[in-house]
């Protein structure tokens, strides 16, 4: 099974680690200049450094979709500088996870893969994706899978 994850920041990396440990081949996409803050726990660092290791799991930068596919065949997580996730058209993944956390949909469509899961606000399950996940830390619905409504944007006092 091949899964493409849009985003390679800390939340996307956590998702990737879980899927990788379940034996799933992974390609992550991010910006050419990643904006991750917690860089030591982000696979996005592979774009800057060529490769990185998080919790003992290796990820390596790929420059093309074909190179990414070859890396996944070797059991290595591939990370592409591909913010629009154009690689999806070439890789034909079994599932797509949007974990960009941009608070709005930046181009993920329910037709991008047989299974499309979106993490964070800005997505409507059944319209943009098959299921949406509410990621707000500390909220009782954290990690809740939503299949029929929109994820909410919450404002927290500073």
Residue ranges and their predicted role:
Residues 1-158:
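Well-ordered secondary-structure scaffolds
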């Amino acid at each position: 099974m091949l899964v493409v994850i849009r985003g390679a920041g800390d939340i996307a990396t956590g998702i990737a680690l879980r899927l990788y440990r379940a034996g799933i081949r992974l390609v992550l996409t991010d910006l050419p200049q990643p904006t991750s803050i917690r860089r030591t726990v982000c696979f996005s660092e592979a774009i800057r450094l060529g490769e990185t290791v998080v919790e003992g799991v290796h990820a390596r930068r790929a420059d093309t979709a074909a190179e990414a596919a070859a890396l996944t065949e070797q059991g290595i997580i591939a990370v592409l500088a591909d913010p629009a996730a154009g690689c999806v058209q070439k890789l034909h993944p079994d599932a797509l996870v949007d974990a960009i956390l941009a608070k709005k949909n930046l181009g993920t469509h329910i037709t991008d893969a047989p299974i499309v899961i979106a993490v964070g606000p800005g997505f409507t399950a059944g319209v943009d994706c098959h299921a949406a996940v509410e990621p707000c830390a500390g909220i009782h619905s954290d990690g809740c899978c939503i299949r029929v409504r929109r994820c909410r944007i919450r404002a927290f006092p500073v």
